[in-house]
Amino acid sequence: MWHLLVWIILLATAQQMITEGCPAGCQCNTPQTVFCLARKNSNFPRSVPPDTLNLYVFENGISSIEESSFIGLNGLHLLDLSHNQLSSLPGGVFRNLANLSNLDLTSNQLTEISADTFQGLSRLERLYLNGNRIRSIHPEAFKGIESLLELKLSNNQLVTPPAFSLPHLLLLDLSYNAIPVIQQGVFNAGNIESLRLAGLGLKEVPEELLSGLKNLHELDLSDNQLDKVPPGLHGLTKLNIAGNVGFSQIQVDDLSNLPALQELDLSGLSLQTLPKGLFRSSKRLRAVSLAQNPFNCVCSLGWLSEWMRVSGVVLLRPDETRCHFPPKNAGKTLRQLRDSEYGCPAPTTIQMPSTMPPSTTTGPPTTTKHLQTEAPTTASTTTTTIPHQEQEEDTQPFQFDFEDTLCPPQTCLNGGSCHLDPTGQLECECPPGFQGTYCETGPVTPAVVTEMYIEQVKIIEVTVSSIRVDLQSYSQNKEKLRAIRLTVRNLYGADRRPMIYKLPPTLPEYTVRALSSNSSYWVCLGSQGEGGPEEDLCTETHTLGEPPKHSPQVTQSQEGNLTLVLVPAVAAGILLSAAVAAAACYARRRKGKGHSVEDGGPLEMDGVKKGLDGKGEVKKLSEDPTGPEKTGAESEEPLMDSTRIGNNNDAPTGRLPHSYF
């Protein structure tokens, strides 16, 4: 009876293993998380374990989903369907996912959002729809998902956005749509902290448009058509107005209401100078970007270098922050420019014209030629005398031919040609393979790493056989991120081939398993966006030295996943059957030995046991005519002759071979 109970337990365990198996082509190495990344199957994965909380179906080529796709997944918290080919979503397709809090539909082919698309998602907090072809959104599309915290709609084809009546919304991204005018009342979400309106074609941002956003901290207005800082901005910690090429002047008062400002991006504008004291009100400023502006590096801009040295503010993209004019400074970076190169006068008294207060410096009295001047118009009646020869030399530099000296050869780098554009601005025409305002960027120039954000790969946890890597801190500041590339390589082991993982950008962390203990690994993170792969950030880490106490877990299932589950179960069943059979055999033999002691068999009655040896002769096994008579226990014979138990070659070994089970 006891072996029957064992069989029942074994079958129940096998059934549980089958039920909780990983879908074909997916990875299930993290509890309650399924990764189906770049799977070679355009159908939605089947047999997803019902206790799954996080399901990543990233870049699978899926073109359609149905409500039945999510049957049994009521506990799902995160669903990543990004980088597929979904062109439409049936109404109520997600209604059974009442516990879903994160839905990522980035980079599909969706064209519209209906009123019931997100029906039933009352707990949804993050909805990512960026990178689609959405032209219209029903006014009631977001009704019923008032718990939403983040909504991303960038890189679509929206012309008129709906009213966002989402009381808990913290982040709204509408960047790179065709919305040249935003009507008042669109932002009915008073708790928004981060608003991204880049690349919409905005010519102005009325003060009343943002007046209701009292908690606004981050504002992105880059790549629009603005010519001034929008009025009425308060409480911002991050302001980005880069890429507004019509923006040619900035005033001190433009930043006077932003004392909490920490990051400011003024790159890609048409600024030729910055007024002294521009950042006086921004006491908390940590980083500023001034790249790709046509700066006129003369005395009026000389204060900037000194301010950067003493303030400690980081200049972002320093190699792209260069002088445009005058010719002697053209192409030089502001960071390398010396104070004396701004052309400011030396701190000594210099001679001035006669209409100004008299100078205390005069020429040598023995060689001076006096010039008669008109009486000064001021109260002073002193006539200044200066050497005529020196006057001609001092004024000569200001009498150059403007057209001949505006575009000297050294202005454009790497063989670029200089000329004036229709607006009178200096412009460089770069040779093939070079780019930038001054042709300073070559074809193999590595990407400039921002000084402020020299990131390191963050390792969350290291064990004897695994490394858990933080992905969120890497991806949070990167725009248009298509995928994260994680590379892990053993530095000193026998197998130093890199292991490369392509992961979705929404994944907060990832655990690399089945690593060698007490080994050094090189861990790198890279990103793949619209601009191609970026330079990796790497770090070295070391797994712990203690050997793992448990067998490594099978992390990936292939098409034969069911077979891999059944084989161990069948093997265990065979082993159990063998054990039961051995026990039964042993019991029968014990019983047989008892009978032989009491009665004895026919051969034993005669004192002989017939058996064939190698020569076919009959041997006596139990009786020795010359020995003393044996009775009781002394007459027992062994069940097996140890001299006849051996391997497949019949060589005597004296013991049974090991079982393969």
Curated annotation (Swiss-Prot):
- GO cellular-component term (any): membrane
Q: Where is the composition biased (Low complexity)?
A: 348-385
Q: Which residue numbers delimit the EGF-like domain? A: 403-440
**What is this entry's stated membrane topology?**
Single-pass type I membrane protein
Q: Does the keyword Transmembrane apply?
A: yes
The residues on the Extracellular side of the membrane are: 20-563
> Which residues lie toward the Cytoplasmic compartment?
585-661
Residue ranges the record marks as coiled coil? none
Spans of LRR repeats, please give: 52-72, 75-96, 99-120, 123-144, 147-168, 169-189, 191-212, 215-237, 238-258, 259-281
Q: Which residues form the LRRCT domain?
A: 293-346
Give glycosylation sites per the record. 99, 518, 561
Chief subcellular location equals: membrane
Which residues, if any, are the signal sequence? 1-19
**Fibronectin type-III domain boundaries:** 455-543
Where does this protein have compositionally biased stretches of type Basic and acidic residues?
A: 606-623
What pairs make up the disulfide bonds? 407-418, 412-428, 430-439
Function according to Swiss-Prot or TrEMBL: May act as an inhibitor of TGF-beta signaling.
- Name of protein: Vasorin
Source organism per entry reads: Xenopus tropicalis (Western clawed frog)
The upper taxonomy is: Eukaryota, Metazoa, Chordata, Craniata, Vertebrata
Q: Which gene encodes it?
A: vasn
